[in-house]
Amino acid sequence: MNKALFLCLVVLCAAVVFAAEDLQKAKHAPFKRAAPCFCSGKPGRGDLWILRGDCPGGYGYTSNCYKWPNICCYPH
């Protein structure tokens, strides 16, 4: 019984370590939480940010158009 309990504890600890490592990688993952969108009069595809009043910083957005209550942000 003690060996089985010890084995379960080891497996649980290993799962916690691997889950924490995966979360650290996810924090630095280079992806945006935006959907594709298109604005009339603008070439290419923009990023649709849902329920935002302005474009978030750090992504290089230079122009936008509003699609109420969302905003479509263009990087070029």
UniProtKB/Swiss-Prot annotation:
The record's GO molecular-function terms, alphabetically, read: ion channel inhibitor activity; potassium channel regulator activity; toxin activity
Asked if the Swiss-Prot or TrEMBL record annotates the protein with the keyword Ribosomal protein, the reply is no
Q: Which residues form the signal peptide?
A: 1-19
Which GO biological process annotations does it have?
regulation of blood pressure
Q: Tissue range of expression? A: Moderately expressed in the ectodermal tissue from the distal and proximal tentacles, body wall, and oral disk.
Q: Which UniProt keywords apply?
A: Cleavage on pair of basic residues, Disulfide bond, Hypotensive agent, Ion channel impairing toxin, Nematocyst, Neurotoxin, Potassium channel impairing toxin, Secreted, Signal, Toxin, Voltage-gated potassium channel impairing toxin
Entry GO CC: extracellular region; nematocyst
Where is this protein primarily located?
Answer: secreted
What organism is listed for this UniProt entry? Anemonia viridis (Snakelocks anemone)
* Maturation propeptide residues: 20-31
The Swiss-Prot or TrEMBL record describes its family as follows: Belongs to the sea anemone type 3 (BDS) potassium channel toxin family.
Listed name of the protein: Kappa-actitoxin-Avd4g
Q: Which InterPro entries match?
A: BDS_K_chnl_tox, Myo_ane_neurotoxin_sf
Q: Where in the cell is it found?
A: Secreted; Nematocyst
Q: What is the annotated role of this protein in its UniProt record?
A: Blocks Kv3 voltage-gated potassium channels. Reduces blood pressure.
Q: Name one Pfam family in it.
A: Defensin_4
**Disulfide partners:** C37-C72, C39-C65, C55-C73
